[in-house]
């Protein structure tokens, strides 16, 4: 007796027919997505070997150490060479003669 009354209510009331299943889908989907996204975070939390972790901590590279490496380098004697466009010949543009680049075999 209870089932026909419920089915009749679903057919007559659009909120019960469309709204409740939609809300169940949204709420259930959010719980499902939470489980799938938790897998991603669990995979990232992998343990590292302690010896390897010590080596990585010793080899820290800082901005100051890199600056000290290139501080004494000279960058004043460089030449700006424009790269060729797709329709240009790169050998002629850069001052190289294509005939002189070919090796002569006799």
From Swiss-Prot:
Cellular localisation: Mitochondrion inner membrane
Oligomeric form and interacting partners: Associates with the MITRAC complex. Interacts with MT-CO2/COX; specifically interacts with newly synthesized MT-CO2/COX. Interacts with SCO1, SCO2 and COA6.
Compositionally biased intervals (Basic and acidic residues): 77-88
Family to which this protein belongs: Belongs to the COX16 family.
Keywords associated with the record: Disease variant, Membrane, Mitochondrion, Mitochondrion inner membrane, Primary mitochondrial disease, Transmembrane, Transmembrane helix
Organism annotation: Homo sapiens
Keyword Transmembrane: yes
The protein's role, per its UniProt record: Required for the assembly of the mitochondrial respiratory chain complex IV (CIV), also known as cytochrome c oxidase. Promotes the insertion of copper into the active site of cytochrome c oxidase subunit II (MT-CO2/COX2). Interacts specifically with newly synthesized MT-CO2/COX and its copper center-forming metallochaperones SCO1, SCO2 and COA6. Probably facilitates MT-CO2/COX2 association with the MITRAC assembly intermediate containing MT-CO1/COX1, thereby participating in merging the MT-CO1/COX1 and MT-CO2/COX2 assembly lines.
Disease connection: Mitochondrial complex IV deficiency, nuclear type 22: An autosomal recessive mitochondrial disorder characterized by hypertrophic cardiomyopathy, encephalopathy, fatal lactic acidosis, and isolated complex IV deficiency.
Topology Mitochondrial matrix: residue spans: 1-14
Primary location: mitochondrion
Membrane topology qualifier: Single-pass membrane protein
Tissue: Widely expressed. Expressed at higher level in skeletal muscle, heart and liver.
Sequence ranges on the Mitochondrial intermembrane membrane side: 38-106
Region: Disordered, residue numbers: 77-106
Gene Ontology cellular component terms for the protein in this record: mitochondrial inner membrane; mitochondrion
Gene Ontology terms describing biological process: mitochondrial cytochrome c oxidase assembly
Protein name: Cytochrome c oxidase assembly protein COX16 homolog, mitochondrial
Name of the gene encoding the protein in the UniProt record: COX16
Keyword Transmembrane in record: yes
């Amino acid at each position: 007796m209870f089932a026909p009354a419920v089915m009749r209510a679903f057919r007559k009331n659009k909120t019960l027919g469309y709204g409740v299943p939609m809300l169940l889908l949204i709420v259930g989907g959010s719980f499902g997505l939470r489980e799938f996204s938790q897998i991603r975070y669990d995979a990232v939390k992998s343990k590292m070997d302690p010896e390897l972790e010590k080596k990585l901590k010793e080899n820290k590279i800082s901005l100051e150490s890199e600056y000290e490496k290139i501080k004494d380098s000279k960058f004043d004697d460089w030449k700006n060479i424009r790269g060729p466009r797709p329709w240009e010949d790169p050998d002629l543009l850069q001052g190289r003669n294509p005939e002189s680049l070919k090796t002569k075999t006799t």
